[in-house]
Amino acid sequence: MKKLIQTIFCISSLFIYKPVIAEPQGLLETIHKHKFLTSTIPDNGDVNPYAVIVSQVTKGQLKQGDILIDNFNNISNLQGTGTTIVLYRPSTKETKLFAKIPQDLKDCPGGVGLTTAMTILKSGWLIVGSFPSKDGTTKTKGDGCLLVLDANGQHVTTWSGPLINGPWGNIASIDQGDSETLFISMAGFDVPSPEVIDPVTKFPIIKHEAKILRLEISETDDQVPMIKSQTIIADGFSQRADLANFLLGPTGLAIGDDETLYVTDGLDNEITAIPHAKTRTKSEGKGELITKDGLLAWPLAMVITDKGHLIVCNGKNGQVVEIDPINKKQIYAHWLNANQAQSPPGNGNLFGIAMASDKKGFYYVEDDINSLRIATP
């Protein structure tokens, strides 16, 4: 009987003391692998990968799941002079040039320097931003434009005008069947040369003229997309010329299921929210503060997960940060690039980011070695 009681006690103890494994609060806690996929340098020597997007369509040169990366610098490493888009196909591990746009394109004010503003419409048309420079600084910047390419990488038309000035950050979008709504940060308004110094900070002066532009686009498979309307839905974001980074301004844009637009402001080290982004008729200013400082260190490009969390690349270190925007909570920081050659480690190495097709991981670029990588569980 005594042995039976002891046996029962031991068995019950196993159940009592069995460890409970907590469910991950978000995506980053599940990420454990970082894999190199390809170099992002094409034959012409362009460097400094910026935008990363995943094709959701199969058309022309594009297959669903293809990754496209653009370059901001030319072979001389001058910022605002990159003209190429590279395609990587995960299914075959093939890397090839998708598009090369003439640097002195006449209908783009100032020429071509491809930025983080890039997206593929469901009809296969690609939109990419240009914020050009002649000498690699804002001293010789042009207003730039939005370039429309077909699914074979050919330039077909250019969008420019008074509301398009320095298209800079991620393009967030809402699909509506025969039309699409795009949200793009415009960071070029009133930005001076980096030689214009604030006497107090001893850094280039900070302006607060960056804006978020909403574009309503008509699209079909066969007709070149056209702009139906343009509306400034947010303004007052900080921007500053910078010799090392060309420009500091609002870079990350992501749209939630409730049509709230989230925006990163690197100079103010914060993320804000613009409610009713699809339907609002006037500017919300900088919007509602979601989170500031903490794990953020110059937040740049940003994506949104299936759970509605934001994944943000830090510019001042090699970390990404996960944020619950509804509860305004910073959840987790994860190292993607801990290169000790920079201080802090990974400083300036991260920029573009895109969710993988299975939503379990994400693609990102490393500027220090001009590469595309994937982060997975």
Q: Which residues does each predicted region cover?
A:
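A detector of repeated loop/turn-to-beta-strand junctions in beta-rich toroidal repeat architectures
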Residues: 81-82, 141-145, 196-202, 206-209, ...
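Loop/turn-rich, solvent-exposed surfaces of beta-rich toroidal or solenoidal domains
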Residues: 266-270, 291-337
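Beta-propeller blade signature
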Residues: 82-91, 141-153, 206-218
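Beta-rich, blade/repeat-based domains predominating
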Residues: 41-65, 80-82, 102-126, 131-133, ...
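Short loop/turn segments immediately following the C-termini of beta-strands
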Residues: 72-74, 130-133, 141, 185-189, ...
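Short loop/turn segments immediately following beta-strands, especially the blade-tip
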Residues: 88-92, 215-225, 274-282, 323-330, ...
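Structural signal for beta-propeller blades
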Residues: 77, 85, 135, 146, ...
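Surface-exposed loop and turn segments in beta-propeller and other repeat-based domains
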Residues: 24-45, 91-112, 148-167, 218, ...
